[in-house]
Swiss-Prot record:
Gene behind this protein: rpmH
Full protein name: Large ribosomal subunit protein bL34
Entry-linked PANTHER family: LARGE RIBOSOMAL SUBUNIT PROTEIN BL34M, MITOCHONDRIAL RIBOSOMAL PROTEIN 34 FAMILY MEMBER
Transmembrane segments: none
Keywords, alphabetical: Ribonucleoprotein, Ribosomal protein
């Protein structure tokens, strides 16, 4: 059986990257929350 997680840098960046987050209002909210919490890494 194939595992569910098949890593790909491209897909990761496109779905969870900084520019993907900045593209939507909700994505910007995510970044704001993570900044407020004091995360060193805002996006993977």
């Amino acid at each position: 059986m194939k595992r569910t997680y098949q890593p790909s840098v491209t897909k990761r960046k496109r779905t969870h990257g900084f520019r993907a987050r900045m593209a939507t209002k909700n994505g910007r909210a995510v970044l704001a929350r993570r900044r407020a919490k004091g995360r060193h890494r805002l996006c993977p």
